[in-house]
Regions:
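Short, ordered loop/turn segments at secondary-structure junctions
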Residues: 4-9, 52-54, 114
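Short coil/turn connectors at secondary-structure junctions
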Residues: 8-9, 43-46
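Short acidic, glycine/serine/threonine-rich loops at helix termini
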Residues: 11-16, 60-61, 121
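Anionic-ligand binding region
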Residues: 13-40
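N-terminal loops that bind phosphate or other acidic moieties
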Residues: 24, 55, 126
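Solvent-exposed alpha-helices and their adjacent loops that cap or buttress functional pockets
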Residues: 38-43, 101
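A C-terminal functional module that forms or caps the active site or interfaces directly
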Residues: 46-111
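Terminal amphipathic helices with adjacent charged low-complexity linkers/tails
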Residues: 64, 123-128
Length: 128
């Protein structure tokens, strides 16, 4: 597990979990080089890159933890399971946080797309 700019595994809505990652890389160039070397060595499998949510969209840990716990409890009470669980939880957490979790989720997606694109550009330079 690679942490992009972090030595901690970032949870979904916040930046810190207290759990370490195996490696910390700080630039798209470093990510591309790691993938390139792995490919050159013929190693199978992927690389899991964890990318923290931007600081401006990171939620207060106590607030989001409380919302998640309440949403999980409600899902149990409402008999939600299987593939219906994720959409139920996301909607419930959004309601419980007044929409803040949705804003955070959207920014997390944008941030991941930016990093993926930047790393892909750097990888293309290495594989010419």
């Amino acid at each position: 597990v690679i942490g992009y700019g972090t030595s901690e595994l970032p949870p979904f809505y916040t930046r810190k979990s207290g759990f370490g990652v195996d490696y910390e890389l700080d630039t798209p160039e470093q990510l591309a080089k790691a993938f390139h070397v792995k490919r050159e060595l013929g190693l199978r499998g992927g690389l899991l890159v964890t990318n923290p949510i931007p600081e401006a969209y990171s939620m207060d840990k106590e607030v989001i933890d409380k919302a998640i716990a309440e949403a999980v409890e409600d899902a149990k009470k409402d008999g939600i399971h299987g593939k219906a669980t994720t959409p139920y939880l996301l909607a419930k957490i959004k309601d419980l946080t007044g929409g803040d979790s949705l804003d955070s989720n959207i920014q997390l997606v944008f941030n991941n797309a930016r990093l993926g694109a930047a790393a892909a550009v750097e990888l293309s330079k290495l594989e010419k």
